[in-house]
């Protein structure tokens, strides 16, 4: 595989056709990252500078560049066996958004997609403070996702949040993927959702990883209740006997697992809202905190990347696929990460599955 060097939005300027190893990690919810190790000669040192962009062979066509990485660190090392080696590491274009925070308080109400687009517009594309604008940054077409912000999203406000971190959190909550790519000399922000390729639908051909198909090398099934809670007390504003307190959960006996929930972040907005409304907000917040402690059930596994199904042909990052292990335990799980690696021993392409609770 060849790797190409880009000069920002100006396109490809050079090619890397020889290296010791590369790891290219592309993520559905999080920020992509990479590591490239190659000869530490003058040519490589001079051309692989911090801020340069890298793109893989096969990830670009007709002015569109995907899975682009930004060089953020360089390390030059020497050993008797290896000689001088240059290691460059960095992250994907998504990490551009880690350079911005939510500057002004933003209320989270309504549909998820318009809220995300508004946050990007207000803090990246058309901010009030002109110095905060990122030039040549645009948004892809709206996808029309119907997801509504849950009333349990803390106090439904953002202020000072790192945008890349917030994007990972909110997209994971609603199973939405996000990306930043280059098209026609513009940085393009997009939201997307993977296809359903499980047994639970009839539109797409199911993609099944199972020992029966010789495409599941190993698997691990986990069912864990160590962090599980299903009842609790939520303490809100006020002190002592004047503190607002509600209880959540109705389990009883040995089936009841309690926790204390600090609801001080849930605001009554200076008593602008009624007491009844505030207690409802506290209850919703408590329910969301309980939800975060639910039973963990997941299947992990290593698949044969070039077996019966091939990534980027039969299934893609973000898709829901079916896993059936040796004990006929079946799970619908999302491809949340694809790690490509290459060295002198060859190349591998390993998908990573989500926990069941994530989807």
Regions found by a protein language model. Give the residues of each.
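Oligomerization/assembly interface segments of phage tail-like spikes and tubes
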Residues: 24-42, 83-96, 234, 293-307, ...
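Solvent-exposed coil/turn segments that connect beta secondary-structure elements
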Residues: 74-76, 91-95, 194, 237-239, ...
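Residues that flank catalytic or metal-binding motifs in active/ligand-binding sites
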Residues: 32, 67, 86, 174, ...
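Short, surface-exposed beta-strand/loop "edge" segments at domain boundaries and coil↔beta transitions
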Residues: 11-14, 43-46, 61-65, 95-99, ...
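Well-ordered beta-strand positions in beta-sheet-rich domains
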Residues: 65-70, 87, 206, 245, ...
């Amino acid at each position: 595989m060849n790797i190409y060097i880009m000069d920002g939005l100006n396109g490809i300027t050079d090619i890397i056709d020889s290296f010791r190893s590369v790891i290219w990690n592309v993520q559905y919810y999080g920020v992509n990252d990479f590591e490239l190790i190659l000869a530490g000669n003058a040519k490589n040192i001079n051309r692989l500078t911090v801020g340069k962009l890298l793109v893989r062979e096969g990830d670009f066509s007709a002015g569109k560049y995907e899975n682009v990485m930004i060089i953020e660190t360089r390390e030059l090392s020497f050993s008797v066996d290896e000689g001088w080696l240059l290691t460059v590491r960095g992250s994907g274009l998504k990490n551009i958004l880690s350079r911005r925070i939510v500057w002004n308080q933003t209320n989270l109400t309504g549909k998820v997609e318009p809220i995300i687009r508004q946050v990007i517009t207000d803090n990246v594309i058309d901010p009030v403070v002109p110095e905060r604008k990122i030039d040549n940054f645009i948004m892809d077409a709206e996808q029309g996702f119907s997801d509504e912000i849950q009333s349990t999203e803390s106090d439904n406000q953002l202020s000072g949040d790192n945008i890349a971190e917030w994007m990972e959190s909110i997209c994971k909550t609603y199973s939405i993927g996000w990306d930043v790519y280059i098209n026609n000399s513009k940085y393009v922000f997009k939201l997307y959702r993977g296809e359903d390729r499980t047994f639970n639908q009839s539109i797409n051909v199911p993609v099944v990883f199972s020992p029966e198909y010789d495409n599941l090398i190993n698997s691990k099934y986990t069912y864990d209740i160590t962090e599980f809670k299903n009842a609790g007390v939520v303490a809100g504003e006020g002190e002592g006997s004047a503190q607002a307190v509600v209880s959540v959960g109705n389990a009883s006996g040995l089936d009841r697992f309690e926790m204390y929930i600090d609801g001080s972040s849930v605001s009554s907005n200076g008593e602008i809202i009624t007491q009844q409304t505030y207690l409802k907000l506290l209850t919703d917040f408590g329910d969301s905190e309980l939800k975060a402690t639910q039973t963990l059930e997941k299947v992990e596994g290593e698949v044969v990347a070039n077996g019966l199904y091939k990534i980027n042909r039969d299934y893609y990052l973000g898709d829901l696929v079916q896993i059936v292990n040796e004990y006929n335990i079946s799970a619908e799980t999302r491809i949340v990460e694809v790690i490509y690696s290459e060295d002198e021993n060859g190349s591998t392409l390993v998908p990573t599955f989500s926990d069941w609770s994530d989807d």
